[in-house]
Amino acid sequence: MQKGKLLFFTSDYKIGQSSLLTDQLMALHKSEQEFVAVSGENEQEAGLKERIADIGIDVRRIEGLDVHANFMGLARQIADIVRQEDVRCVHVQNNWQILLVVFVKFILLRRFGLKIIYTLHGFRNNSPLKSVIARVIIGMVLLLFANRVICMSTYLKRKFYFLGKKAVLIPLGISDEYFLPEHPQLPDKGLQMVFPAQFRHGKNQDIIIRAFAKHIQKCNDAESHLYLPGKGELQDEMVRLTHELGIADRVSFPGFCTKQEVLQLYLKCNIGVIASNSETFGQCIVEPFVLGRCVVSTHVGIADDILVDGENGYFYNSEDELVSVFDKLYHNQILIGKAGNMNFNKKQMFAWDNVTERYVGLILKLWR
């Protein structure tokens, strides 16, 4: 039984209404939980506002919400919504939002029974020093003010072990268009691999490129191809690396891709390969998993929660280990299909309806 109304933030810093949170909002709309959605005036990609308007979701737009300025003005607007809608629980997505809500709760409204849920999306996790500092600062804020903290993977929950019972494990969902009724056919010639990610430090596309070059030379592989969609400060450096290694014709750089374009790349491939130092969740892990692709990954994000090495995926800890994985799968391509089939059969754990059921259950427990 629902006990009150939820205020759900659907936008993030410098992004506006995000694609991910739009999917979550649409799933929440199908549940019995009553909510009010709030967002900044911008959107991550064109069409997100129309998607939710088409199904009758009204989002309160607060100008400047996703810019770190005008704190008092934003807090007053949020306080008005909480008061007018009799909100009993607020779900925030970043540190700026939780500070605004804490100010509303304790200073503007003095509504001490207002519950706060926080989703951990990131914490400078590709920089060791910044990661430690961020965990300490964020952790202190969450210990003091959050009632529950959603961690999207066991990997992330361990990073914030000191939150104790406040931390709950609920994964993210994946967009409905990734849930195909039948297992899409896997390419059967060579390793067709994809890693969608920003080109920045910590994503390590260079490790994949070098390992791929070594594999091609070692196995005389004339069939395989690597796709690296995304953009960022290191993209030109990665392109140069492929030329230096003589594999420029075997690696494609499609640039920024929409969700639908990334989906089409996955369907051209039989392997999702991940090289990140760290992921809080790892959509780049889950998307190929849901589509029934083999997943090759470092031990980050949700990978250890869903992959068993040598069965439905493969782990590696170094460039040389990645070369060995490439060689093994190239010479035993039946293993790619076996892993893909296992993953496709487990895909429903990431359907938004199933994730939302757990999420609404969390809210109900807060009101008991």
Regions found by a protein language model. Name each.
Residues 277:
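Aromatic "clamp/platform" in nucleotide-sugar-dependent glycosyltransferases that forms part
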Residues 92-98, 120:
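Short His-centered aromatic/hydrophobic patch
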Residues 309-310, 314-320, 328-333:
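Conserved acidic donor-binding segment of nucleotide-sugar-dependent glycosyltransferases
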Residues 7-9, 186-203, 209-212:
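Conserved donor-binding/catalytic core segment of Leloir-type glycosyltransferases
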